[in-house]
Amino acid sequence: MQQYSALVRRRYAEIASGDLGYIPDAIGCALKALDAVAADEQLPPAVREQAAYAAANLLVSDYVDD
């Protein structure tokens, strides 16, 4: 867990403790978040590209795994 940001670790702890709701469709949740980052024109292009690349890889892995 230490490789992840403090915010990710905090949300993980909140979900694990039941303080924050768990979303069963984790890939769908991640894709929505990554797509929102990729679409945000106020963010630096490098950040948007990184999010788009991660989302595309999730889409490919989701279809390959089915």
Curated annotation (Swiss-Prot):
<dbReference type="Pfam" id="PF06786">
    <property type="entry name" value="UPF0253"/>
</dbReference>
<dbReference type="InterPro" id="IPR009624">
    <property type="entry name" value="UPF0253"/>
</dbReference>
<comment type="similarity">
    <text>Belongs to the UPF0253 family.</text>
</comment>
<protein>
    <recommendedName>
        <fullName>UPF0253 protein NT01EI_0864</fullName>
    </recommendedName>
</protein>
